[in-house]
Amino acid sequence: MSGIGRRRFMVGVSGAAGVLAAGFGVAGTAGSRSPAQSGEHEEKADARAVSTSELSTFFATAMVGNAVEVDSESDGDLWVTCWADDDNLYSVNGDGSGFADGPRHDIVVNRISGDPKSGFTGEVLAVADEVGAIWGDPAHYNRKPTGIVCVDGRLYLAIQDLRLGPGDIAFNDAPAASVSWSDDHGRTWHKTQQPMFTGGVFTTVFFLDFGRDSGYAATALGADAGRYVYAYGLDGNWRGSFTATVADPFDLYLARAPKEAVEQRNRWEFFAGLDGDTPRWSKQLTDRRAVLRDTRRQYPTLRNYREWPHNLSVISQGGVVYVEPLKRYLYTSWTEYTYEFYEAPTPWGPWKLFLTKDFGGYPWFGRGPGCPGPKNGGYATTIPSKFIAADGTSMWVQSNWWVGSAGGDTAYSFNLRKMTLLPYRAQTPANQPDPRDNLAYTGAAVTPIEKSAHFGHTEYYNDGDFTKSENSFDQENKDLDFWGFTWSEPYLMNQVVYTTGEMFDDGGWFAASLRVQVRQDFRWIDVQNTKIEPRYPYTASTGAFTTYTFSFATTSGDGLRIIGKPGGSAYFTSIAELEVYYR
């Protein structure tokens, strides 16, 4: 199947700055006609939630870019990446020509130089049969890279068979996988004689990234455990199987192999649970236990459900990276329309969700003349360890996107967007009353949050410009909508000033239960006895660019949001500005 064919079925994820665990978010800009013009009604979506025991309390704020920020002259997707001993990145793409103008292949090995500031150049080193085998019928399956690691100068590359077709079954099952290896930095590859994993069991494999040449492994785990390469695996498919060809993956598994023998299947051991805090390992695949299980579904219904996927499982092919300054492991997963990011103190957990970034249903917007965005997410989310800041609080996310574009450049290339994470520190609010101090401007590490932002302009509702409008139209008939901020330290507050954005025939206002919430100890708490002036009408008569003031007794928190049931037949709200005061 051609690359275009693959792009039709393989849709991307993410692209604003989301919320869930610690409540992070984003926003964009509204157009003059209804944003739901081509939408199609389906039954109302159920509210989605994760129990508090599964939510992280490690990061006070987290934000990831609304769209691609750094692009490159390359072609392809997936872009599994490692940082090698020679200080280069080695990245393997699927379905493209890589960093070359030549023919397109199902798998391409590239060496990449540069950084997000100076830009990237690359060189193609090997392609197709030079890299790995197709274990099934080549008429029905081709090769896809799922993970790569460098250890002691050797590259190990995990490759799976992924369904080609016919028709809609493409990309919906992955029955076999193996590992190729290179001792000359990617120019020559050696292959196993048979697949290492079959039957759709542990067939999406991605390696734990311990930095340059896996240099942090021994530091993080100790000399003995640091002798191994660690690999995560999914069963069935690399993401949910949109045609139910196989079961959707709900479980993330962990294995390890001696760093000199990753290609030898009989040397692998699988995480089989804990004895106290000590992991147990078994050579028997049947003994394995999941390190993370998440059965949530995103977008259980969709207004344009006949055209695009919905009811999406959240465990997918991404990456796991160790952030040494924070002593934390990050797993970057995704769905068609969201990023799903987790953190843990050890490779085996406990894994907890710290960020859901919701980009809304299609269409998305690329960067280009006349485009209202950009706002776009992507699939196969990874964090190259080479570009993690020295203090561990900023890094760059790679993901890809092709289908569902309303204009502008898509992201079918090696590209990056910035993510910023600030660890939580318990503090006491110390701000003094000041009628002019708008915490939406002056708060520490102020981070906009929302359910979703149609055009990805998260800066609009704390930029002081009351003429710009963002809205939350996202193709979902949602029960709740919100706009707000989180901070890296707590504040006293007693007033919120909300200015609406543009109104549409099918939405733009809150329909019921509009209220203020503050975040305390990572829980969102309703503020009691709030007075709204003027009275909020809960209809289209709310008015475009109209200001409402919420006054309440002094409270404190390291986050604030207005929340309620969205209005109109398309279930969305709008915003121009949100101000927060302690007066």
PLM region spans:
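N-terminal secretory signal peptides and thylakoid transit peptides that target proteins
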Residues: 1-17
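Beta-propeller domains
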Residues: 54-60, 88-138, 162-173, 185, ...
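Structural signature of eukaryotic scaffold interfaces centered on beta-propeller domains
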Residues: 73-84, 138-151, 206-225, 317-324, ...
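Beta-propeller blade signature
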Residues: 105-114, 175-185, 250-258, 343, ...
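Active-site cradle of extracellular carbohydrate-active enzymes
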Residues: 228-345, 358-359, 368-369
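Conserved blade-ending motifs and adjacent loop-strand segments that build the rim/top face
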Residues: 353-387
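Aromatic, loop-rich ligand-recognition surfaces of beta-strand-rich domains
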Residues: 466-528, 544-583
